[in-house]
Amino acid sequence: HIKNNEGATMGTGQKLYKRAKKIIPGGNMLLSKRPEMFLPEKWPSYYSKSKGCKVWDLDGNEFIDMSIMGIGTNTLGYGHPEIDEAVIKTVKDGNMSTLNCSEEVFLAEKLIEMHPWADMARFARSGGEANAIAIRIARAASGRDKVAICGYHGWHDWYLSANLSDDKSLDGHLLPGLEPKGVPHNLKNTVFPFSYNRFDELESLVEKHDIGVIKMEVIRSMEPEDNFLYKVRQLANKKNMILIFDECTTGFRETFGGIHKKYNVEPDMAMFGKALGNGYAITSV
């Protein structure tokens, strides 16, 4: 609802967002892009075009994007000419067919070349989807259902089930006070969070539960300390657990490929996204 005289000071984007909140749950498709996360009532909300590090709102105002560059996806900038040229060519040639696209083979080969520990690769569209695929594969490979996690790994039921045991379980990993409504209760006690750089917490989980999979972000807001990643790798080896590195956020930034290469610790599986497509929907496992 727009109050009296408020519309005179509001931009087109702010007005449109008020309409959106009436018909779209949360107002948009992604929490990270909601105006409430930045500057409520003043955030432009929508863009008309983007290029490099700049965006233009619906009123034509130009901004330098110093926030999150498309939630961390556009490391090469918005509208990169070489990337867009390839995409436009694909659209013109036809981007859908009963047959497969040959590029998936070339990309799989390149990812394996960059990560010699890997044997195969497959693709998805979002980080959450890639994480769900990886969890299913890892559970099958380990023969065990229980997973230890550290970090943010999407919104699928397997991950949010951590809050069925304690609604504070995902504090510091996702959001505080998150209620796992709609998540099947039979998933309770299948996922157990541990804190980054707290190897003792992970050891305790492994001793108390039949953990088959460790899934974690390689780094979060701090660097690994006291050989943390190496210790995790050794524990996984000792207990025959599958170690998965979620590199959707960290991959292709400090290193060409996964940032785990910087620390010389190899996982059994890894996910990549965001920077992998520079704004286009693709992730890999």
Enumerate the language-model features and the residues they cover.
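Active-site PLP attachment segment
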Residues: 264-285
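Glycine-rich loop-to-alpha-helix module at the N-terminal edge of alpha/beta enzyme cores
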Residues: 62-144
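PLP-dependent aspartate aminotransferase-fold enzymes
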Residues: 106-213
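Active-site core of PLP-dependent enzymes with the aminotransferase class I/II
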Residues: 198, 204, 216-239
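Buried hydrophobic positions in well-ordered alpha/beta secondary-structure cores of metabolic enzymes
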Residues: 27, 60, 87, 111, ...
